[in-house]
């Protein structure tokens, strides 16, 4: 089963602001996790329960994995100092 990545408007806006090299790294990483999105991510806790984090160098991608629809909803992207 392959999941589909669906970016939110906030994710798309912040993604466009990133350096082209970083964008390429993030795209490549997200394409690799579509087969098994929980294998490399980490579940978040507290006020972000139900969301997952992917670590890509100094950047983080926050997602919500929807198993019933096979969707990875990309919520936020940014440098680790700014994302939480």
Predicted segments — roles?
Residues 22, 26-33:
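Compact soluble domain cores
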Residues 31-53:
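A short, surface-exposed loop/turn module that caps and links secondary-structure elements
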Residues 12, 38, 50, 77-78:
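A generic, residue-level signal for flexible/boundary positions that often mark functional hotspots
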Residues 7-9, 29-30:
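A short alpha-helix capping/helix-coil boundary motif
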Residues 2-6, 13, 17-24, 56-59, ...:
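Enriched for short, Lys/Arg-rich terminal
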């Amino acid at each position: 089963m392959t999941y589909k990545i669906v970016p939110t408007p906030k994710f798309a806006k912040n993604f466009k602001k990133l350096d082209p090299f970083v964008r390429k790294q993030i795209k490549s990483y997200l394409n690799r996790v579509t087969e098994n999105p929980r294998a490399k991510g980490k579940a978040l806790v507290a006020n972000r329960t139900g969301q997952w984090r992917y670590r890509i160098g100094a950047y983080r991608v926050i997602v919500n994995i929807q198993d019933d629809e096979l969707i990875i909803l990309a919520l936020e992207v940014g440098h680790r100092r700014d994302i939480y």
